[in-house]
Curated annotation (Swiss-Prot):
The gene is metK. Binds 2 divalent ions per subunit. K(+) binds at residue 45. The lineage of its organism: Bacteria, Bacillati, Bacillota, Bacilli, Bacillales. The keyword Electron transport does not apply. This is S-adenosylmethionine synthase.
Length: 399
């Protein structure tokens, strides 16, 4: 590797990975509830293991949803439909342990500190406080059209295409569990120049050879996802490097909601506040705050105000207004952090109810985000991925 160059690696997983099964179940339950009760409070956690799904959490709603049916339908859609896979949508046990949201938390969400203290400016917006304290990050970079880091973008692309090859029976020996990983080499100007390493581990039928899998992935997977200009004779490929991946899914590993937070975001390229997304209604700023931060970051880069930017927002439980906003452009902007923050504060409402209204989050849009990443999804119409405020932001800041 040339002097002053460096490598960066990100990974993704398929929708059949145990942790992603759990995420998708949690978000499918959330979608089912808020489609009938948009104001419901949902904090839904799922764990999956051999032959068993446990759904637990705190849900406050006036509607009924058939949780066991949602669980089975989700597992079936993912592809675990045969007992020989070690996990079967029809025969697995489904247990539920659901409580209501704590009244101590509810009182701060139902009526924010600003509202309770008589300091509200906009009663409807100030009325909802943050559902918890915490810090969230949003990130954007101009190294891809989707304004995402290249390593995670390619890792997601491989995982998504691999799933497509399985579900369309193009490669009918594939089974649901899979992981992908991409290592990108960056030059001295921090621009991606080549792919150094690709790792794919995919569950498969016991009778298929590893040689056949490798041949098929080089034919049907890699050319469909990765621009050939990034590949060279030194690019390394590791395909099922253990030599066998028959036992997978919940039979191989237990899965839990919220255990793939780096896969869900930027692949480690940006910092993470620690809060997971799936199973949480939009009053939970772990989710809505991170979406809003991405929305802000993406519009900053789309406006040409920076080439790369990380936005942090932080909240106190029961308080509507963020306790802090910070913006780091890594030296790629001609504008000060304060100029950017002033523009963001004028154009983006980062109070929980403001975010919910701005991004129209009280809708059943979450199940589709629970695999292959929440950001950079050109295959989905996600409100936090829009750049509709870029021009207005540019006019505010560029004098």
């Amino acid at each position: 590797m040339a002097k002053n160059r460096h490598l960066f690696t990100s990974e993704s997983v398929s929708d059949g990975h145990p942790d992603k099964i759990a995420d998708q179940i949690s978000d499918a339950i959330l979608d089912a509830i808020i489609s009938k009760d948009p104001d419901a409070r949902v904090a839904c956690e799922t764990t999956v293991t051999t032959g068993l799904v446990l759904v637990a959490g705190e849900i406050t709603t006036s509607v009924y949803v058939d949780i066991p049916k949602i669980v089975r339908d989700t597992i079936k859609e993912i592809g675990y439909t045969r007992a020989k896979y070690g996990f079967d949508a029809e025969t697995c046990a489904v247990l539920t342990a659901i409580d209501e949201q704590s009244p101590d938390i509810a009182q701060g969400v139902d009526e924010a500190l600003e509202s309770r203290s008589g300091k509200e400016i906009d009663a409807a917006i100030e009325a909802i406080g943050a559902g918890d304290q915490g810090l969230m990050f949003g990130f954007a970079t101009d190294e891809t059209e989707e304004l995402m880091p290249l390593p995670i973008f390619l890792a997601h692309g491989l995982a998504r295409k691999l799933t497509e090859l399985r579900k369309t029976n193009k490669l009918d020996y594939l089974r649901p569990d899979a992981k992908t990983q991409v290592t990108v080499e960056y030059d001295e100007f921090n621009q991606p120049v080549r792919i150094d390493t690709i790792v794919v581990s995919t569950q498969h039928h016991p009778d298929i050879t590893q040689e056949q899998i490798a041949k098929d992935l080089h034919t049907y997977l890699f050319p469909e996802v990765i621009d050939a200009s990034f590949l060279d004779e030194d690019t390394k490929y590791f395909i099922n490097p253990t030599g066998r991946f028959v036992i997978g899914g919940p039979l191989g590993d237990a899965g839990l909601t919220g255990r793939k937070i780096i896969v869900d975001t930027y692949g480690g390229y940006a910092r993470h506040g620690g809060g997971a997304f799936s199973g949480k209604d939009p009053t939970k700023v772990d989710r809505s705050g991170a979406y809003a931060a991405r929305y802000v970051a993406k519009n900053i880069v789309a406006a040409g105000l920076a080439k790369k930017v990380e936005v942090q927002v932080a909240y106190a439980i029961g308080v509507a207004r963020p306790v802090s906003i910070s913006i780091d452009t890594y030296g790629t902007s001609d504008y000060s952090e304060q100029e950017l923050i002033d523009g963001v504060n004028e154009l983006f409402d980062l109070r929980p109810a403001g975010i919910i209204h701005m991004l129209d989050l009280r809708r059943p849009i979450y199940r589709q985000t629970a695999a292959f990443g929440h950001f950079g999804r050109s295959d989905l119409d996600l409100p936090w991925e829009r750049t509709d405020k870029a021009e207005a932001l540019k006019k505010l800041i560029v004098k």
